[in-house]
Regions:
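Bacterial N-terminal signal peptides
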Residues: 9-16
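Pro/Thr/Ser/Gly-rich low-complexity, intrinsically disordered linker/stalk tracts
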Residues: 24-67
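Recognizes extended acidic, P/S/T-rich segments that occur
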Residues: 78, 83-114
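Extracellular Ig-like/FN3 beta-sandwich strand-entry sites
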Residues: 116-118
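Extracellular fibronectin type III
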Residues: 130-142
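Low-complexity, Pro/Ser/Thr- and charge-rich linker/hinge segments at domain boundaries
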Residues: 141-170
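Aromatic-lined, polymer-binding surfaces characteristic
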Residues: 227-392, 398
């Protein structure tokens, strides 16, 4: 009994101590939120001591854009094309050795290490008449022992981008070597087995594949579209895995049977965009992903009409995603599914068609610079932690 009383007393004392400690640790906030959903302040902040050299320059959009709330529920937002200018110098009057740039999005990467000391910068929105609306002049500091992280500029990257295909999943110059290295690779064999299975199971039209027994009972438009997307994604995701298997099987063997069945299957999938059962950004990004992989892997086998079909699909879907992201994604504090999936796919499409699709050069410029501006993380202590399932989303092929 005495031991029980002592235990209760110790527990009570511990709770009082913990409560007192917790009270001391309370942070009183004066702001409405801990962070902005959409950027409202420039970076670097005025007077900031930079943590990584060179700094990435970002500022609020002239026309902040929230985007759609739910995948598949389209919203018409006013989002005009914009032009921004930026200038950076050691003096606040910007009279000598000024770094200047003009961008179609609200960020800029200088790709040069900054000397230690005090720097000044300013950004401007340029209207259609060419009039500049300049921000206040901000200053920041480059300290003595700052970390450096200066990736190559886009111009340097593009000099090393192969002009031949394939060039995304593998480099054509290393193709035969990759095949030889992976003859006994279990992962490579798994792709080939899956592709062989697809050869014996022709694909039906979406309306014959999708299960809509529960969807048709819904009367709420949001629930209806959400359920429709969920059911159609089951089919589209399955076929993405099948096309992926046939693309990989061809790259691992150069056996044209995988191209012939794969392009037939993909052509059927691309016809689904006219179906009332096909909707949503995830489905569109999957279409973009499949078309990009097929275009790059089977480039040398495609007929003129097949190549035209894939390029048109990449152009139409890539254009939509680019327009959705530019002057939106760069100023969102977090948009995790975009970074994991749809934006990554736009990157692949951009580099796969660079030099062959006129607008791909703009996509490449935006995508590459957006990655650089957001790395090595959203803040000085790194990026966001991922769970096991999120790590699975970033898996790559070991045979590559």
């Amino acid at each position: 009994m005495m031991k029980q009383r002592i235990s209760i007393f110790l527990l009570f004392t511990l709770l009082l101590f913990a409560n007192g400690y917790a009270q001391k640790g309370i942070m009183r906030l004066t702001q409405q939120t801990l962070m902005h959903e959409v950027r409202e302040t420039p970076s670097p902040l005025d007077g900031q001591h930079i943590t990584v050299n060179p700094p990435r320059f970002m500022w609020p959009d002239k026309f902040p854009h929230l985007g759609a709330v739910l995948d598949g529920v389209e919203e018409e937002d006013y989002k005009p094309e914009v032009t921004y200018r930026i200038r950076i110098a050691r003096d606040p009057e910007f009279k000598s050795e000024v770094i200047t740039a003009e961008r179609k999005w609200a960020f800029f990467n200088p790709f040069k290490l900054f000397e230690k000391g005090k720097w000044y910068w300013q950004h401007a929105y340029v209207n259609k008449e060419g009039k500049e609306e300049w921000s206040p002049v901000y200053h920041f500091y480059i300290d003595e022992h700052i970390r450096t992280f200066n990736p190559p500029s886009l111009q340097e990257v593009l000099t090393k981008l192969p002009k031949t295909h394939p060039r995304i999943l593998l480099d054509a110059e290393d193709w035969d070597n990759i095949i030889e290295r992976n003859k006994n690779n279990p992962e490579a064999q798994a792709y080939i087995r899956k592709a062989d299975k697809c050869l014996n199971h022709p694909l039906k039209h979406l309306e014959e594949e999708i299960d809509t027994t529960q969807v048709v009972k819904l009367t709420n438009i949001v629930q209806y579209r959400s359920a429709l997307i969920r059911e159609s994604r089951k089919i589209v995701d399955r076929e993405e895995a099948n096309i992926e298997a046939m693309v990989h099987a061809y790259l691992l063997t150069k056996d044209e049977v995988y191209y012939k069945e794969g392009i037939k299957r993909l052509s059927e999938i691309l016809s689904w965009k006219k179906s009332k059962y096909f909707a949503g950004d995830f489905n569109r990004s999957t279409i973009l992903s499949m078309s990009t992989s097929a275009y790059d892997a089977w480039y040398n086998l495609l007929t003129p009409n097949e190549r035209k079909l894939l390029l048109r699909t990449i152009r139409d879907n890539g254009k939509k995603f680019y327009h959705e992201y530019v002057n939106h994604l760069e100023n969102r504090i977090a948009d995790n599914h975009v970074w994991q999936m749809t934006f990554r796919i736009l990157n692949m499409a951009a580099f796969a068609t660079y030099g062959e699709l006129p607008m791909a050069s703009t996509w490449v410029d935006y995508c590459y610079n957006e990655w650089v501006s957001r790395l090595p993380g959203l803040n000085a202590d790194g990026g966001w932690p991922v769970s096991y399932t999120h790590l699975r989303a970033h898996e790559t092929d070991s045979y590559l």
